[in-house]
Amino acid sequence: MWRGVPGCLRDIVQWQVALWSHSFVRTWGSCGKAMTEALSAQAEAAGGLKALVQPNGDAGSNTSGEPLLERLEPAAVGKQVPESGDQAQGGEGQLPSNGEQTPAPVADSGKRKKRRGATGERVVPPPKKRRTGVSFSDEHFAETTYYFEGGLRKVRPYYFDFQTYCKGRWVGRSLLHVFSTEFRSQPLSYYEAAVRAGRLHLNEEPVQDLSIVLKDNDFLRNTVHRHEPPVTAEPIHLLAENNDVVVIDKPSSIPVHPCGRFRHNTVIFILGKEHQLKELHPLHRLDRLTSGVLMFAKTAAVSEKIHEQVRDRQLEKEYVCRVAGEFPDKEVICKEPILVVSYKVGVCRVDPRGKPCETVFQRLSYNGRSSVVQCRPLTGRTHQIRVHLQFLGHPILNDPIYNSTAWGPSRGQGGHIPKTDEELLRDLVAEHQAKESLSMLDLCESDLTPGLIDSTAPSSELAKDSLEGLATAAQKIDGIAEAAPQHLDTPEKAAKADVTQETDPLCAECRVLRQDPLPQDLVMFLHALRYKGPDFEYVSPIPAWARDDWQED
């Protein structure tokens, strides 16, 4: 190959090969020690090149006159053939020019390196499954205790963590921006005090600065001092219990499961704490103000079996209610479709775009002012009975939503609503604000933020243990503009209060004395009387307001 080629040119070519090899090794150094040793052997062949090339300057210098070979690292040339004794003393790992030692190449261990961001970049850990299931354990039940006062079941205030992963619309925005635009129920001073108190965590690390920019998969946790509204002190009666199901007579005013501001004051928690009935599967649901038969399955298999019966229309549900006016004495069937106006407020209406529904009504009695009506829903839409009765012109007598003047002069009869959905919700909320009865809508002042109308958002996105609940539970109260007291200006003073105490220095709700709800605020005249299937039938006692001799106050 080299026959007829001058020796000097041959040496130059070999040197160029060694130089290219050096560049390759630096780029792909992780390929292993074997490759490095092979390239070093090749470089040894050009060991005397420096002395041959530099005198005539053909290839030993660049345009600046600096010898190229002097700038090569020993990892590229391997063992150099010594030109003099002082160069030979260093051996492998020596720089030819200054004698500084460079570590020899290290072979790849074969282990995958931990992902690191660029200098100064915040690395977000991968998401984790943080919930093992939907059931609640003794740890949850032990968060707080009940006490009873004035015919009400009350919950002692307690600390609670709202948790969520960063939502897509938050990515690239600072925490400060998110709080100031989406959680305006509290002033920024509250969140700043929460940072000082160690209440805000990002990926389980305390937030030090609200200016931190959120990334995808960021996990946020906010600790709040939680207050729950009172419910009736009426006990939950068991109608039946066996190896498959638990059946209760649910009192009015108690939600079935945690939602909004309610957690311990729910059927699920009361059954777990007071009856040791845990890991139950709700087979259907009742509105908070609705009373009557409520069924739970004890196993997933039983739950699936009964839900299959529901899909096959094998179950029969029967309700009783008291409605305004004289209901027709013949059977009435309503098939009007129902559309959700707002998941957050919990408002629906008849609309052609809604889901198909069917309810069968039959009057049972009339006392001259109101009627007791039997209701048999053949479908199971939200507020189906209440909306259909409103459409028929006979709303439930004390329905806080569908018997309201906010719907207009006809109160929604025949679907005539002379206002937009936005106007309807605004007027409905304003009416209850004036009566100081927002709790009838399962709202408080802190809920009255932009975005009240959210007809496209599923309710699960608005409630479950997430920062969405922050606007509900962070507690901004009427007339309180500053949620973070001035004496919390140091980390020591802002330290998290003892979890056993019922007051918290950051909590505005702790500084407000709220009136208890009146007895009439805890009841709606709608009762689930009977639940019947192919092999079971459960009936609850008829309430006092449904009797023929009942008279209005």
Curated annotation (Swiss-Prot):
InterPro entries: PsdUridine_synth_cat_dom_sf, PsdUridine_synth_RluA-like_CS, PsdUridine_synth_RluC/D, PsdUridine_synth_RsuA/RluA, RluA_PseudoU_synthase. Pfam families: PseudoU_synth_2. GO terms for molecular function: pseudouridine synthase activity; RNA binding. Residues 76-135 are annotated as: Disordered. It catalyses: a uridine in mRNA = a pseudouridine in mRNA. The active site is at D287. The keyword Secreted does not apply. It is an enzyme of class 5 (isomerase). Its EC number is 5.4.99.-. GO terms for biological process: mRNA processing; mRNA pseudouridine synthesis. Keywords: Isomerase, mRNA processing, Phosphoprotein. The modification Phosphothreonine is found at T490. The keyword Secreted does not apply. It comes from the Eukaryota. PANTHER family: MITOCHONDRIAL RNA PSEUDOURIDINE SYNTHASE, PSEUDOURIDYLATE SYNTHASE RPUSD2. NCBIfam families: rluA_subfam. Pseudouridine synthase that catalyzes pseudouridylation of mRNAs. Belongs to the pseudouridine synthase RluA family. This is Pseudouridylate synthase RPUSD2. It comes from Mus musculus. The gene is Rpusd2.
